[in-house]
C-alpha cells in the first residue's frame, strides 16, 4: 500500500493498493482508517465511489478483495478553530496542527565565551519583524471564525515543508500590536491578560504551522475592536 498525501496540511489522503506476486491477483483484508476527533464530515471513497461517511473519533473499515490499482481516498475536512489558554489567550488551530505567527528570523553564529561543555560556539536567532500582536476578541467568536481567518494553500512541490519559507498553508487574520508587551530577558515578556485595549491600528498578520517556525507566538492575547458594535 502506497500513501500519497500532503497531510497534515491538505485534507485528502490517497492510498494506492499494490498486490505483489505473479499468481496472486487479489488480496482480501479489512482496511481500517481512524478518523480524528477534530474532524467533521469525513468521507471514504474507493476508486472514486463513496463508501462511508464515518463520524469523528471513529474507525472506518472497508473489507473487500483488493486489486492492484485500487485507490482509497480519505478526506478529512479541516476547519479553523480557536481554543483558549493561559490568561484567556487564543490559539488558532486547523485540523491536527496549531498555527503560530510568522516572524522574520536573523541567524547568527556566536562564540561561546564560557565553559566549552556544549562546544565553542552556538547559533542564536532574533526577530526581524514585529511579534507583539493581539488577535481581536470579536474574530475568535465561533460565528466569526470562518470569515475572520482566511486559509491560503501554497504548492511547494517536493520541497521540505517544515521551514519558514516553505510552509504549505498560511492563515491570514487581523492583528494589532500591543506596545506594552515587550522582550524580557531576551524572550517574549509575560503573557498579557486578555482583553486589552490599544489605539494601534489593525494589521493583517500571517500564521503558519507551529512546526515551521523557530521563533513563534502561538498564544495570542485578545483586544477589542472598539470601532464596531458586534
Roles of regions detected by a PLM:
Residues 19-21, 34-37, 64:
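Non-cytosolic beta-sheet module surface loops
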Residues 26, 57, 67-69:
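Solvent-exposed, conformationally flexible loop/turn segments
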Residues 39-65, 82-87:
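Solvent-exposed beta-strand/loop surfaces of large extracellular or lumenal domains
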Residues 28, 37, 65, 96-98:
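Residue-level preference for alpha-helix termini and adjacent loops
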Residues 26-46:
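Beta-strand-rich binding/interaction modules
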Residues 3-19, 23-25, 55, 75-230:
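C-terminal beta-rich recognition modules with glycine/proline-rich loops and embedded aromatic residues
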Residues 30-32, 62-83:
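C-terminal beta-strand-rich structural cap/linker in extracellular carbohydrate-active enzymes
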Amino acid at each position: 500500500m502506497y500513501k500519497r498525501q500532503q497531510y497534515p496540511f491538505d485534507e485528502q489522503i490517497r492510498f494506492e493498493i499494490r498486490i505483489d506476486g505473479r499468481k496472486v491477483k487479489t488480496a482480501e483484508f479489512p482496511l481500517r482508517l481512524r478518523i480524528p476527533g477534530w474532524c467533521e464530515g469525513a468521507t471514504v471513497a474507493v476508486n472514486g465511489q463513496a463508501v462511508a461517511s464515518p463520524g469523528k473519533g471513529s474507525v472506518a473499515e472497508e473489507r473487500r478483495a483488493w486489486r492492484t490499482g485500487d485507490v482509497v481516498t480519505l478526506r478529512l475536512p479541516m476547519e479553523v478553530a480557536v481554543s483558549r489558554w493561559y490568561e484567556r489567550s487564543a490559539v488558532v488551530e486547523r485540523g491536527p496542527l496549531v498555527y503560530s505567527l510568522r516572524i522574520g528570523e536573523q541567524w547568527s553564529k556566536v562564540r561561546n565565551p564560557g565553559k566549552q561543555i556544549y562546544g565553542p560556539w552556538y547559533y542564536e536567532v532574533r526577530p526581524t519583524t514585529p511579534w507583539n500582536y493581539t488577535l481581536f476578541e470579536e474574530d475568535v467568536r465561533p460565528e466569526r471564525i470562518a470569515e475572520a481567518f482566511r486559509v491560503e494553500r501554497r504548492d511547494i512541490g517536493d520541497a521540505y515543508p517544515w521551514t519558514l519559507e516553505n510552509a504549505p498553508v498560511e492563515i491570514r487574520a487581523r492583528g494589532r500590536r500591543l506596545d506594552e508587551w515587550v522582550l524580557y530577558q531576551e524572550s517574549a515578556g509575560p503573557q498579557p491578560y486578555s482583553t486589552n485595549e490599544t489605539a494601534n491600528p489593525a494589521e493583517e498578520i500571517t500564521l503558519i504551522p507551529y512546526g515551521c517556525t523557530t521563533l513563534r507566538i502561538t498564544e495570542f492575547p485578545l483586544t477589542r475592536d472598539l470601532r464596531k458594535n458586534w
